[in-house]
């Protein structure tokens, strides 16, 4: 007898003499063997199940994705060294920040390329773009022949390279972990929030890497992504996991959550104590590197377990073949009494509509999604890009401390959705991504208004809030795209969505630079000092974020039915009759 709606637990296989034997299809830890006579003493061999890809290979691809995400934010350290660039006005600095985002306008090319080109090559192309974009700037930064438009184009090229690596990471997380795709995506993308922290720690650990701070960061931005991409390229493969042990999945994700929390805690502690000596910075970098390497233990442990299972299976088959010639074998695998509950993914009753191409642009939901993202997540990114100038205008000397703080809290913000997805799946419920985004935008709007207070404490608190919410919105948006428009055209659809980032970066960044320059001009100076420099900007940004929150609420109301289409996980008791 089998549970309703599930395939029968027992299948028949014809024996050589016309008799039947039964083999249970339920994976278990207990095996019962009996014998029955067959004609002529013929020996019967059990059919072996189809081999599926090793589960350790899936986790190896996720570890590779995590490492790629960790270094795939070289543009996030721009606020640290932007003030070091000579002969560049505040407006031009904002245009350079926009240039990195402008590369995302052509990010959809990476989605198309991923349909026809192996993923390691796609990632390598992205790393090459970054190597050329930042490497040429490093070599020619002090050259009088380097014009502003050269910097703009090179920065845009490097920004486009980020899209290529992100596309690879998203596809690996979505397709290699079909039953836990939202958890895998959120977990992997959370490490992108550590990029600024990693680059600032590397720069502080190796202060003599170049003759200026700007050149140090440009060199790291050019070289580090290429080194990591080449190192992890063999693991960047798609697999078809035909049999998935939910118990193993849950255990592995719980271990990964613990490692991730420890990594985030290390980053926050390092951000708070970033004014320590160089030796302390090196020790912190070593501890952070060790924690980033620890996830490799998960696929290693899974590989050892798989090898042990193969050895056990080979011994069992040898015992079967060594049985007497006058007997046939009936193998019935039953569920261990202590592990009777098994999680099964129930197929969707209502298939989700797949939307892509020009059809996407005709959907009102897309434009609600586009502008709500622009007025929240993109706005937060513009704020983070301007942290250097904001800190300088308020008289804060250690800009890297503020940038590291925003990076560390952005990491936890990106990690938050993975916890929500994991525990909601365990409880059999699904959380609307658009509803999550709307709930994250409200505190972000409050943080912008909080910045109107000139105190340094409010600047640090608001930076932490905006960093957390921006990271969470960015992570949630990856799953929201497939939730709203389907997973088939995800690579192209999400790159079309993130084209709002360069548009918003240009509008919000240029407007803030214009107000900054106007305030400085009114004082008869080239730079502006004091809380009033960005006061009008923060008020306008806060109001804009409120509008984005309202748009996202409307999108949530329109798309609530999508949450019901997501797979539901049920617990059932396996029985063998």
Sequence positions of predicted segments:
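Long, low-complexity inter-transmembrane loops of multi-pass membrane transporters
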Residues: 10-14, 18-46, 236-362, 368, ...
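Extracytoplasmic gate region of multi-pass secondary transporters
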Residues: 78-79, 271, 358-407, 508-509
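Intracellular juxtamembrane helix-capping segments at the cytosolic ends
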Residues: 85, 162-186, 387, 472-485
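Interfacial helix-cap and linker-helix signal at transmembrane-aqueous boundaries
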Residues: 85-86, 113-114, 203-211, 273, ...
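Central cavity-lining transmembrane alpha-helices of secondary-active solute carriers
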Residues: 97-115, 404-418
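C-terminal ends and interior cores of transmembrane alpha-helices
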Residues: 128-144, 443-454
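Hydrophobic core of transmembrane alpha-helices in multi-pass small-molecule transporters
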Residues: 146-164, 458-472
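C-terminal transmembrane helical hairpin of 12-TM major facilitator-type secondary transporters
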Residues: 369-371, 375, 379-381, 394, ...
């Amino acid at each position: 007898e089998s549970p309703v709606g599930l395939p029968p637990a027992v299948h028949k296989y014809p024996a050589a003499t016309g008799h039947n034997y039964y083999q249970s299809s339920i994976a278990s830890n207990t095996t019962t063997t009996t014998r029955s006579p067959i004609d002529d003493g013929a020996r019967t061999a059990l059919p072996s199940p189809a081999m599926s890809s090793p589960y350790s290979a899936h986790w190896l691809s996720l570890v590779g994705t995590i490492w790629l995400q960790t270094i795939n934010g070289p543009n996030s350290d721009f606020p640290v060294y932007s003030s070091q660039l000579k002969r560049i006005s505040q407006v031009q600095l904002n245009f350079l920040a926009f240039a990195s985002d402008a590369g995302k306008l052509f990010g959809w090319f990476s989605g198309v390329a991923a349909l026809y080109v192996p993923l390691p090559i796609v990632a390598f192309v992205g790393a090459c773009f970054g190597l050329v974009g930042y490497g040429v700037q490093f070599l020619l930064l002090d050259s009088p022949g380097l014009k502003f438009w050269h910097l703009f184009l090179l920065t845009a090229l490097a920004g486009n390279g980020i899209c290529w690596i992100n596309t690879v990471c998203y596809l690996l997380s979505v397709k290699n972990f079909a039953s836990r795709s939202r958890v895998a995506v959120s977990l992997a993308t959370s490490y992108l929030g550590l990029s600024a922290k990693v680059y600032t720690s590397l720069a502080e650990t190796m202060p003599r890497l170049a003759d200026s701070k700007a050149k140090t960061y440009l060199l790291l931005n050019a070289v580090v992504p290429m080194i990591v991409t080449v190192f992890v390229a063999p693991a960047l493969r798609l697999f078809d996991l035909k049999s998935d042990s939910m118990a193993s999945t849950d255990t592995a994700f719980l271990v990964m959550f613990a490692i991730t929390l420890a990594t985030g805690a290390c980053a926050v502690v390092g951000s708070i104590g970033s004014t320590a000596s160089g030796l302390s910075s090196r020790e912190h970098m070593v501890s952070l590197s060790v924690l980033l390497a620890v996830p490799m233990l998960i696929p290693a442990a899974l590989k050892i377990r798989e090898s042990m299972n193969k050895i056990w299976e080979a011994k069992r088959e040898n015992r079967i073949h060594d049985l007497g010639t006058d007997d046939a074998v009936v193998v019935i695998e039953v569920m261990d009494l202590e592990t009777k509950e098994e999680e099964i993914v129930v197929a969707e009753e209502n298939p989700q509509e797949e939307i892509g191409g020009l059809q996407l642009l005709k959907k009102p939901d897309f434009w609600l999604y586009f502008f709500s993202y622009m007025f929240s997540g993109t706005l937060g990114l513009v704020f983070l890009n301007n942290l250097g100038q904001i800190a300088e205008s308020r008289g804060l000397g250690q800009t890297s401390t503020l940038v590291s703080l925003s990076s560390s809290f952005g990491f936890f913000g990106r990690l938050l959705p993975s916890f929500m997805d994991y525990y909601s799946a365990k409880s059999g419920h699904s959380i609307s991504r658009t509803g999550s985004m709307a709930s994250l935008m409200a505190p972000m709007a409050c943080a912008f208004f909080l910045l109107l207070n000139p105190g340094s404490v409010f600047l640090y608190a608001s930076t932490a809030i905006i960093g957390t919410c921006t990271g969470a919105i960015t992570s949630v948006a990856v799953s929201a795209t497939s939730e709203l428009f389907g997973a088939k055209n995800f690579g192209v659809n999400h790159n079309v969505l993130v084209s709002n980032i360069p548009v918003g970066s240009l509008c919000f960044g240029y407007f803030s630079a214009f107000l900054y320059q106007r305030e400085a001009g009114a004082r008869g100076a080239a730079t502006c000092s004091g809380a009033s420099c960005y006061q009008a900007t923060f008020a306008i940004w806060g109001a804009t974020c409120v509008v984005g929150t309202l748009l996202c609420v409307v999108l949530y109301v329109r798309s609530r039915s999508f949450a019901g289409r997501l797979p539901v996980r049920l617990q059932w008791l396996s029985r063998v009759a």
